[in-house]
Structure formats: structure tokens, C-alpha cells
Amino acid sequence: MTDKVHLGHRARKRFGQNFLFDDMIIGKIVSAIDPKPEDNLVEIGPGLGAITEPVAELSGHLTVVELDKDLAQRLIEHPFLGPKLTVNQGDAMTFDFASLVRDDKKLKVFGNLPYNISTPLLFHLFEFADNIEHMHFMLQKEVVKRMVAGPGSKTFGRLSVMTQYYCNAMPVIEVPPECFKPAPKVDSAVIRLIPKKPEQRTAKSVKILNNVCLEAFNQRRKTLRNSLSNLLTADELTSIGIDVTLRAERLSLQQFIDIANWIYDNKQ
């Protein structure tokens, strides 16, 4: 049996499949999720059920979103898991997570996210921040570092700003490659994301905030005078209290929000 086959299933490269099998790491992840019978739990990409099974044992029921038809069917037919799952066979990138909110009970979302689509999938999930209580995701360690990076760090970028705009983010566990089959070529880590309350998210337009980040970080080595020249003049930036000689990585989250709100108020 090759390293790509685990529990009779061949990992599919196009789905970014790497299956977690280390019991100690699985136990730590489940402890971090802390599933309870009253929780509205949602797993993205349950795969072969390594985390699904212990979570279902503690919660009694959960909803899963699985793109791979074979794996979805395998979960439906699973003698232990089948009755405890609501299986949605489909793409999490287009899934309406708000549809899973029941009796005003927010979602607790978790999963081992495919590394090849993790960033766009996170941005999709951020759109449902008001429907989510917390999230726990296995990601490439470098992605987790970028998500929690602060101003002045070389890894501080658009993902850092947008993650921290929507959520309080904390690394939980580091996971080496040998805990998976097949072993990925990168280190992994689990991150905890707790969405902020709506009143804490003060951007008047998230679309503009995201666009400011795209422009600012597109050419990281440029100063803000140049990198944001398509959006604001140097004088306009100065009027907001922004030092135009800085690079984007030196700005705080609040300064990005201030720029976005100024554009919303003055450039519409």
C-alpha cells in the first residue's frame, strides 16, 4: 500500500487531501474544539473521519461539508458515524453556512482545510462571521503565522489585516508532517478564530478595506505614497494621519480601517 492510500482511500491531489492519523494530535484538536451535545457543530472536509468520530462521540450530532463524493458516501454509510451526521456533499467555497444556523444557535466550525484553497476559503467563511461562535482549522503553519502577524512583521499582509478585522486569532497546536498520510511537504498548525462582535468591526465597507489591502500589499517594497496612488493622493493620506513614507507592513489594522472609511466617505 502506498503512502497515498489510507484506510482504503487514495488521497486525491486535486482536493488537497492529507489525512490526519496521529491520535495524540487528534485528541488535542478535539479538546480545543470542546464539543458538547448542545453545540451546532460543522466540519469542513471531514475526509476519513479522524476528527469527526471523536467529535460525534462527544456531541451526538454534527453537520459536515465534503467535496469528495466517495468520502461523503463513505460517511453516510459509516455504521457508527452515519446516524450522527448530516452530510452535505459539495464545495465549502460556495456553501451558505448561514443556512445551518438553527434556533439562533451559532456555528462552531472546524476542519483540516485543503492547503491549496485555504486562503480563499477563509475569506468566504469571514463573510459568515455573524453566524459563527468560533472556528478551529488545521492550516499550513506559514498561513497561521501570516494570520496572526502584527504590524512590522515581514509576514504581515492582507490575510493578517482581514483575519484580525473579523476575528481574534490564536495559534493552538503545531503539527509535523509525519502526522498525516500522505505527509505534506510543509509543517501544519491549528488556529482558533473567534469572530468579533459587529460593533467591533468598524469598516464602513469591507470591500473597500479589502481593496486597500490588495493595493497596499501588492508591491510590498513601495511606500504608501506609491502603493496607494490609485486610491488616494499623498496629501489625502496625510490628512488621515498616515505617514506616506511608510510601507504597508508598518500600518496598524485601525489605520487600514481609517483609510478605507475615508475613501468610503469621500470617493464614492
Curated annotation (Swiss-Prot):
Q: Name the enzyme's class.
A: transferase
Q: What is the lineage of its organism?
A: Bacteria, Pseudomonadati, Pseudomonadota, Gammaproteobacteria, Alteromonadales
GO MF terms, alphabetically ordered: 16S rRNA (adenine(1518)-N(6)/adenine(1519)-N(6))-dimethyltransferase activity; RNA binding
Name listed for the protein in its UniProt record: Ribosomal RNA small subunit methyltransferase A
User: Which source organism?
Assistant: Pseudoalteromonas translucida (strain TAC 125)
Q: Which PANTHER family match?
A: DIMETHYLADENOSINE TRANSFERASE, DIMETHYLADENOSINE TRANSFERASE-RELATED
| Alphabetical list of HAMAP family matching this protein | 16SrRNA_methyltr_A (MF_00607)
Which Pfam family, any one, appears in the UniProt record? RrnaAD
Alphabetical list of SMART domains matching this protein: rADc
